[in-house]
Each structure stands twice: as structure tokens, then as C-alpha cells.
């Protein structure tokens, strides 16, 4: 099975050129042609108003992962080139700026698995077959059992890749961290199934239902476990269960969801994909720009919830508090890495990402 990585949308950038009248008439600046939206300033506000720190091992880890994933996922040459250009390693390098090479490569490898695993549920083999989708999830999660036979790439590339990631994670992590990552992987797979179910509903989900569903399937929860592992964090489970710690994790998922929906909206329109909160808001009578502005308000609400959660954190003592600070920073870095990667990769905006980031303007088809 070869991952069906999404072909990038065509570049649609273009600068309007000033039009001059004769002699003394003032210069008139032509309005940009086409349908545009202005991304909300909230994308880069509050905890997102920082420049990301990039792991210096980023390019080395990318080269190693690109080669390994091509073999593990049985990519043909064309798919391998597309995957390399997506450059998921850039996101990993921001999510875990202090990780060693082995751990950073593990993050890249897992990101390779999750993108390849997710696509058939979005628009491929399992999107219209809930029974087959459930079977795939059951067989996939079974590979996390420590007594499961080793899966070869020829037998099943996706299960082989996840099992390899899990075995490497298990070798170097504590039992509590293993428990959390396995739990997060299960939550992700359940979220993917919920998304398949929503696609078969006659009506769109509410905003609350959509955000709950996306929190499970957006993939941020497993990233949090990998970030803990990469940054050397090992927080006791009773501390992780505190409402403020749970809130920080959930807000991270919400930030990633809203960032993704804004950055992928043009691609979604081009490809006819409607799993995006903007379509739900437009069903409520909003224009494209009004929906985007509403997402900006939702981002500001995320930042307020974040700071409220921090204010309600207890004090556990120097050792635990130090790890809690690293955890909070790591969760911020996950959202920060997702945001900067989304405007850096060609997956969503072709070659226009840097210009969209600079101007906050996105041209729609």
C-alpha cells in the first residue's frame, strides 16, 4: 500500500501592478483580481507571536527519515519525491528543538506514518466504508501489543511503520510515558473513525461536535507524547490528570485544528473536501471572510483559555514544576510548528505560502 500523498494545488499568486493616469492625475492602485480572504492576525498573536526555534539536527534527521520511509512504506520514486518536498521534518524540528538525532528521526517517521494512514480515511479506501475502516483501526492498534508478531513492510507497510515507531519508543521511554502514548494513539484512531461516521451524516456537525471530533483525529495528542519523550519530560500521571494540564493538551489540539482549517481552505475548495470548520460557519450564513474572522475570535478564545489554565496550575515542587514548564512550552511548540510548517510546505498553498504568511492574504479559486 503506497500512501496517497496529496498533490499540491497550483500556484495562484500574483501581484497587482499600479496603473498610472496621464500627467497630473493621481496614481490608482488596481484592486487585486479574484476572490481573496485576509487571514486573522490572531494566527500569530499571543503564544504564537514568537519565532520558532528549529532543531539544528533537522536536515540530518530529514535525510535519514526520507530514506527509511521510502523503504518502510514501499513508496515509488514519484511518491518519495513528493514526500520529501512536503518536509514534515521541519515541523518535527520545531516541535522538539532539543531532541537528539534518534528521537527526532522517530518523530519524522511517525509523522510519515500518520499522514499515510490518515489519507485513506479522508478520501480513499475507507472514507465510504465504516466497517472496513473499523477493521483497519483494530488491526493497526493490535500492533502496539508487545506480543504481536513483527510485521514486515511487504506484509503491510503502514502497520510495519507504526510498529517500528512503537518498538523504538518503548525501548527508551518510561512505563508511564508508554501508557500515555498508547492511549493517545488509541484516541487518534477512534477520532479517525468518528470522522468517517460524520462524513455519512445527512447534516453537518455543530461547531462543538466538530471541534471535539477534530481534537481526536487531528493527530496532536500523539505528538504531545512524542514531544514529552523528545524533550526528556516524565511527569507523574496524577499531575498529567490535573484539569489545567488536560486543558493545555486540548487547547493545543484546538489550535492545530483551527490553523489547519485556515491554511488548507484553498486546497479544500479545489479538491472538494468539506471537512473544514469554515464550511460549517458558512452554513450559518457567513461569508468566507466572516467565517475566517470568526476563527480568529476562536483563536483568541484559545489563548485566553491557555492563560487561565496556567493561572490555575498548582505548585508541585521544583522537579515536577520544571517538567511542567517544559511540557507547556512543548505544547506551544507543537502548535507553533504546525503553523509555520503549514505556511512553509507546498501541501496547502503550493508556492504561495511565504507570500501568504507575509501579507496574510490568500487567493481563493
Swiss-Prot record:
Cofactor annotation comment: Binds 3 Mg(2+) ions per monomer.
GO BP term (any one): isoprenoid biosynthetic process
One Pfam family in the UniProt entry: Terpene_syn_C_2
Origin: domain of life: Eukaryota
Short motif NSE motif, span: 260-268
SUPFAM superfamilies: Terpenoid synthases
Metabolic or biological pathway: Sesquiterpene biosynthesis
UniProt keywords, alphabetically: Lyase, Magnesium, Metal-binding
Disordered, as annotated region: 1-20
Deletion phenotype: Abolishes the production of koraiol.
Binding site for (2E,6E)-farnesyl diphosphate: 347-348
Binding site for Mg(2+) 2: 118
Cofactor(s) recorded in Swiss-Prot or TrEMBL: Mg(2+)
Bias type Pro residues, positions: 1-11
Binding, Mg(2+) 1: 118
Statement: the UniProt record of this protein carries the keyword Transmembrane: no
Domain notes: The 2 conserved active-site motifs D(D/E)XX(D/E) and NSE are required for coordinating the divalent metal ions that stabilize the PPi moiety of the substrate. The C-terminal WxxxxxRY motif is frequently found in terpene synthases and is important to guide product formation.
Family indicated by similarity: Belongs to the terpene synthase family.
Function: Terpene cyclase that catalyzes the cyclization of farnesyl diphosphate (FPP) to the sesquiterpene koraiol.
PANTHER family cross-referenced by the UniProt entry: BETA-PINACENE SYNTHASE-RELATED (PTHR35201:SF4), TERPENE SYNTHASE (PTHR35201)
Self-association and partners: Homodimer.
Stated name of the protein: Terpene cyclase 4
Lineage, highest ranks first: Eukaryota, Fungi, Dikarya, Ascomycota, Pezizomycotina
Amino acid at each position: 500500500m503506497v500512501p496517497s500523498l496529496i498533490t499540491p494545488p497550483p500556484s495562484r499568486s500574483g501581484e497587482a501592478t499600479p496603473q498610472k493616469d496621464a500627467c497630473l492625475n493621481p496614481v490608482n492602485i488596481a484592486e487585486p483580481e479574484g476572490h481573496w480572504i485576509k487571514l486573522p492576525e490572531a494566527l500569530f498573536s499571543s503564544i504564537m507571536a514568537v519565532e520558532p526555534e528549529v532543531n539544528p539536527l533537522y536536515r540530518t534527521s530529514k535525510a535519514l527519515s526520507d530514506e527509511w520511509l521510502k523503504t518502510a512504506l514501499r513508496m515509488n520514486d514519484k511518491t518519495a519525491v513528493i514526500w520529501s518536498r512536503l518536509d514534515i521534518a521541519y515541523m518535527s524540528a520545531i516541535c522538539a528543538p532539543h531532541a537528539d538525532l534518534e528521537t527526532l528521526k522517530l518523530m519524522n517517521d511517525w509523522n510519515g506514518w500518520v499522514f499515510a494512514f490518515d489519507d485513506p480515511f479522508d478520501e480513499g479506501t475507507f472514507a465510504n466504508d465504516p466497517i472496513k475502516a473499523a477493521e483497519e483501526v483494530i488491526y493497526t492498534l493490535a500492533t502496539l501489543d508487545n506480543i504481536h508478531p513483527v510485521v514486515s513492510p511487504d506484509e503491510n507497510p503502514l502497520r510495519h511503520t507504526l510498529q517500528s515507531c512503537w518498538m523504538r519508543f518503548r525501548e527508551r521511554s518510561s512505563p508511564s510515558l508508554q501508557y500515555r502514548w498508547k492511549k493517545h494513539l488509541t484516541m487518534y484512531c477512534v477520532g479517525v473513525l468518528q470522522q468517517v461516521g460524520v462524513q455519512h451524516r445527512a447534516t453537518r456537525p455543530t461547531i462543538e461536535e466538530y471541534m471535539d471530533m477534530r481534537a481526536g483525529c487531528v493527530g496532536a495528542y500523539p505528538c504531545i507524547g512524542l514531544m514529552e519523550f523528545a524533550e526528556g519530560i516524565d511527569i507523574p500521571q496524577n499531575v498529567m490528570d490535573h484539569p489545567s494540564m488536560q486543558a493545555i493538551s486540548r487547547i493545543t489540539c484546538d489550535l492545530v485544528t483551527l490553523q489547519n482549517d485556515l491554511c488548507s481552505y484553498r486546497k479544500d475548495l479545489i479538491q472538494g473536501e468539506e471537512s473544514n470548520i469554515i464550511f460549517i460557519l458558512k452554513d450559518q450564513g457567513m461569508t468566507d471572510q466572516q467565517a475566517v474572522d470568526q476563527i480568529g475570535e476562536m483563536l483568541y478564545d484559545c489563548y485566553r483559555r491557555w492563560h487561565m489554565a496556567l493561572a490555575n496550575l498548582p505548585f508541585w515542587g521544583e522537579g515536577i514544576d520544571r517538567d511542567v514548564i517544559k511540557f507547556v512550552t512543548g505544547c506551544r511548540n507543537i502548535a507553533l510548528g504546525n503553523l509555520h510548517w503549514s505556511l512553509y510546505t507546498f501541501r496547502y498553498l503550493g508556492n504561495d505560502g511565504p507570500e501568504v504568511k507575509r501579507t496574510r492574504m490568500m487567493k481563493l479559486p
